[in-house]
Design a protein with these regions (language model features):
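Active-site phosphate-binding strand-loop segment of PLP-dependent enzymes
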Residues: 2-76, 81-83, 88
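PLP-dependent aminotransferase class I/II
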Residues: 1, 5, 13-17, 22, ...
Length: 192
């Protein structure tokens, strides 16, 4: 409903975020996009390795953006990736990330050096070998957090959702200041 309310005649795409690795309502979003003839570009910076019913969240929409920053569950220390379904769009992105060059003598548009350097690419290849172990370790930490926090008044959190393979990249908690006895910000500054 909020997405539909925000659509104007100038809208060309919906850009939802899989925040904290928690998948959006991808079917609902796609239904709205189809109704209005819009593209769907997902911000999947937090969602590497996340699946819904065995299907990667990267398979939904027209494009997904990934961050490979050092703070992510899978990283190359810096950089990222685009997952694009449309071959024509992929080709254009390939040109733009290579200074706009479409060949040795043809420049199609102003571009950037958007390629991952060799060191980060090698680091990423090595990290792919252990990303499943990293996710499994993060899952165990999330289980301990839940066991510890489940009975604390005023503290709530996301539970695992059946059919979703999480990456446990983050463990956000929600603070009810009245029940907990202090606000989220007060707790944050106390724990610093």
């Amino acid at each position: 409903e909020k997405i539909e309310a925000a659509i104007t005649p100038k809208t060309t795409a919906i850009m939802p975020v899989h925040c904290y690795g928690k998948p959006c309502d991808m079917d609902g979003i796609q239904n709205v996009a189809d109704k209005y003839g819009l593209k769907v570009i997902y911000d999947a910076a937090h969602a590497f390795g996340v699946e819904v019913d065995g299907k990667s969240v990267l398979e939904y929409g027209d494009m997904s953006t990934l961050s490979f920053h050092a703070t992510k569950v899978y990283n190359t220390l810096e950089g990222g990736a685009l997952v694009v379904k449309d071959e024509k769009m992929k080709q254009r992105i390939d040109y733009l990330k290579n200074f706009g060059f479409a060949g040795e003598t043809e420049v199609i548009a102003p571009g950037i050096n958007g390629k991952l350097d060799e060191v980060r690419a090698a680091y990423g290849i090595l990290n792919l070998r252990q990303v499943d172990m990293a996710i499994a370790a993060r899952r165990q930490v999330a289980i301990r957090y839940r066991e510890t926090l489940r009975n604390v008044d005023g503290v709530s959190f996301f539970d695992d959702i059946p059919g979703i393979r999480h990456n446990y990249s983050y463990f956000p908690i929600f603070i009810d200041a009245k029940k907990y006895g202090m606000s989220r910000d007060e707790l944050y500054f106390k724990m610093r």
